[in-house]
């Protein structure tokens, strides 16, 4: 319950943000009220439920997916590795699909962290570190291994259409899921948005509110 992946997504679909026009933290906006009201109503009908452990990537949650108590989750792409590592019984039974969107939404999905990585500007070799970081995050070579090893969606979207990579029958993630994961990414590629507050220094304060 301390993670807001689904709330972030729905808020972006509504065109909202956690900051107001003046850059102040605002978690009571009209868009946020609409999102939380929708979630509560879905919970009241029994369609939504909080997973044991509070969020889908906690170890307490995995047995309940394995047993079929929960049919779906809305999570960032890095969750693929949790399936291959912790929910092996579900191999060949899980599909990756585009998330539902509110009618009229320009944004269908957003990027969701995840653990951030930064280069300290005051470091002795900050420029070199930045070059290395850019290579391992953005180059085609590194992007392919980000998918092959970690199961993450690479930031470099050029590799998304490389079917030798994305449909490789020897890839553990291609073998696990019943759909080609990158087919979904390419389907929503032009409607990926973001919450601008993600890069704001106030983001930790927003997390504290929840």
Where are these regions (language model features)?
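Glycine-centered hinge/linker elements that transmit conformational signals in sensory
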Residues: 24-54, 99
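Short helix-initiation/N-cap motifs at beta->coil->alpha
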Residues: 51-66
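Extracytoplasmic/periplasmic substrate-recognition and gating elements
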Residues: 45-48, 85-159
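Beta->alpha turn/N-cap motifs
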Residues: 58, 75-83, 115
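Non-transmembrane alpha-helical segments in soluble domains
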Residues: 8, 36-44, 62, 66, ...
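Extracytoplasmic/periplasmic solute-binding protein
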Residues: 1-25, 31, 40, 61, ...
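C-terminal capping/gating helix-and-loop segments adjacent to ligand/active sites or protein-protein/ligand interfaces
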Residues: 174-210
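Paired acidic/hydrophobic, glycine-rich loop segments that form the ligand-binding mouth/hinge
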Residues: 71-76, 95
């Amino acid at each position: 319950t301390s993670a807001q992946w689904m709330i972030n997504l729905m808020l972006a679909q509504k065109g909202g943000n956690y900051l107001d026009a003046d850059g102040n933290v605002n978690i009571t906006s009209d868009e946020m009220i609409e999102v939380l009201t929708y979630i509560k109503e879905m919970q009241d009908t029994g369609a939504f439920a909080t997973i044991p452990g509070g969020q889908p990537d906690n170890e307490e949650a995995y047995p309940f997916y394995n047993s079929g108590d929960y049919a779906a989750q809305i999570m960032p792409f890095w969750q693929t590795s949790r399936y291959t590592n912790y929910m092996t019984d579900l191999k060949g039974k899980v599909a990756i699909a585009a998330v539902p969107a509110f009618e009229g939404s320009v944004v269908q999905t957003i990027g969701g962290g995840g653990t951030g990585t930064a280069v300290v500007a005051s470091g002795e070799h900050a420029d070199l570190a930045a070059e290395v970081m850019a290579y391992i995050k953005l180059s085609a070579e590194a992007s392919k291994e980000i998918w092959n090893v970690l199961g993450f969606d690479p930031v470099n979207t050029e590799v998304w259409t490389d079917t030798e990579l994305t449909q490789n029958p020897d890839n553990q993630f291609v073998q696990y899921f019943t759909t080609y994961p990158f087919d979904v990414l390419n389907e929503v590629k032009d409607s990926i948005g973001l919450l601008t507050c993600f890069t704001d220094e106030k983001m930790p304060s927003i997390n504290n509110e929840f």
